[in-house]
């Protein structure tokens, strides 16, 4: 998806911010895979607005290079940067603008389905990583679609997700073909909103690229259904499953 052809960057953080608790959860998950390995330089590939970049710098006391093809996303990331250990560069997964053997961790969040050429992107990750270092991937996969909290309210999103998202096995095949081994894979469940009413407000921000692809009629119908559910007592927290891959 070409984010620069949309206005998603302007509301991305509003729709995607799940709070410090979820950010801490993901830093703990990443740390559990890196363990005692010394991490001095991190590539945040597909960094978007930099949601994870400064948290990575703080957790590992490391330099973080955020790379993203979207000018609008990078403008937002640079505008909110507070940590001098973090910098942002334009680039794509298929041609990472970094030297060989230059990073100790590649962090990727929900980017796999955006790669034009996933096999080339995986080879690029292998190229820039130092020997034995971790490529950590958060990803949506087809196997989780039925568990995504908005699918029941936006049924037209299901075929879009089925077309865009890879199968779990395909993600592994792509990285293993690039010379990685799959050290671990798991599913982590994160809270995305404290209630369905709060979840509706997040989705209304228009930050989800799948929902942004729906017709206005289908999107509005889904929002009505979600808000009706919230009004009828959908006060429970909303959760979402995310696939995690540790490639080395």
List where the protein language model places each region:
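Class I SAM-dependent methyltransferase SAM/SAH-binding core
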Residues: 41-43, 49-95
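Conserved Class I S-adenosyl-L-methionine
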Residues: 49, 183-248
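A conserved beta-strand element that flanks and buttresses the S-adenosyl-L-methionine
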Residues: 107
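Short catalytic micro-motifs in class I SAM-dependent methyltransferases
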Residues: 110-111
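A short glycine-rich, Lys/Arg-flanked "PGG" loop and its adjoining helix->strand segment in the class I
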Residues: 119-131
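Short alpha-helix
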Residues: 163-178
